Amino acid sequence: MSSYSRAERAPWGDFPKVVRNGDLGSLTNEPEYQAAKQGDAEAALNLVERLISDDTVAQLKTLIGDDKPRIVPVLAVEAAGNNKIPAMMAVVLADRLGLEVETDIVQREKVARTGAGSDHRLAFNPTFEGEVIPGQKYIVVDDTLTMGGTIASLRGYIENNGGKVMAASVMTAHEGALDLAVKPKMLAGINEKHGPAMDAFWKETFGYGIDRLTQGEAGHLRAAPSVDAIRDRIAAARNEAVNRVGASRTATTARAGQQQSPAVKQSSGNSGEDLLQAAQEAETEQQALLESAPIEQTYQQTLALYVQAKHDQVERIEDRLEQLVDRQQARLQQLQSNAPGLLSLPRTKAAWQQQQAQQQARLQTLHTRLDMVREIKEGMGIHAPKIEELATRKMRADDPELAGDWDSMREAARRHQALMRKQEQEKKQAQERERGRSQSLGLSNKPS
């Protein structure tokens, strides 16, 4: 049984596609974006009011008809601050649709999903609290849709507590991610590859079955080589989150160390000066990491676009090859039904046998290609890199500047971690030297 709080999910039913206002990643270059993500309500209102389109409003009007749902924003605490974009999106939509905003339902904990990778998103889905009015209809709104887990979890909380979520809308999303509900073909693919073990693991770990996942979430399960691989990825993501908390606390301690009195610094000798210098360097590195947050968000959001596009491409190729296999099998059956009789000329039989061999070879070639495509889709086989790897290569080739910024940011993060480890080691060494001096003083002051 997991010790982590569990998000809620509900059966999908006929839940409609999410209404998006713009393309994934389109907000990050807006002048108000960073301030809005960090808690500036005025910046968020200006951003949303300027960008919300008439088409978005019209689509929502069509979905709700004459109903009067309450608009509930994802009120989340981001790593950079209190994200105000969903709240202001709710305000603007409520004004244009003649509806009311629901502010009693809030996210219970901070999961910092903006810019996070897929494993973190699978491992940490937000939970919510607040009064749900039984029988009341709602519209869920958020700033960004990536895999859809946040919207699915908020919808689950509302529906499991007696409400009804009619629709969802976001400022930005990839077009291929708008149909949240996991498709029967996806579930069949997971069960075919992993059997019932994946569903059992998910129920044990998260409290709901794979049929309540989003299509984007389920795709990662289908692509995994095994249930154990997914289990390890979830555990690694949770361990990484714990380590981040520890690193944050270490950085806080380092900053506090800069406030020690001159007398204390002097008593520490050169080791104290070294620690102070290290702490100051850590502060600089920490600031650089904070400033690099937009790079991480842009990189992850852009990569999500490429991954989805690559998934779509592989799906199209698979469907096309399946059609070609079916046609080739039909041709072969037709050819076999027209086999020469016993009294046919030898040359007629030879020509038929040659034609049959050619058609069988063609069918075998198509099967081989189909197997290769499926291996790529599932991330299996020695010649089948994962779709994520293929998407990453293409994205980095298409946008070398973003790739360079990402690499620089990752290098800064590695330097920061190394500095933190060095500082901790020097602190321990200073403490050991201090203990040694204390013991020496104690011995020298002993009466003879």
Swiss-Prot record:
Question: What protein family does this chain belong to?
Answer: To H.influenzae HI_1407.
List, as start-end ranges, the regions of compositional bias called Basic and acidic residues.
421-437
Q: Which terms are listed as keywords in the entry? A: Plasmid
Which residue intervals are annotated with compositional bias (Low complexity) in the record?
A: 246-261
Q: What is this protein called?
A: Protein TraN
Q: Which organism is it from?
A: Escherichia coli
Q: Which InterPro entries match?
A: KfrC-like_dom, PRibTrfase_dom, PRTase-like
* Chain residue ranges for the region called Disordered: 243-273, 411-448
Q: List the disulfide bonds.
A: none
Biased composition range(s): Polar residues: 262-271, 438-448
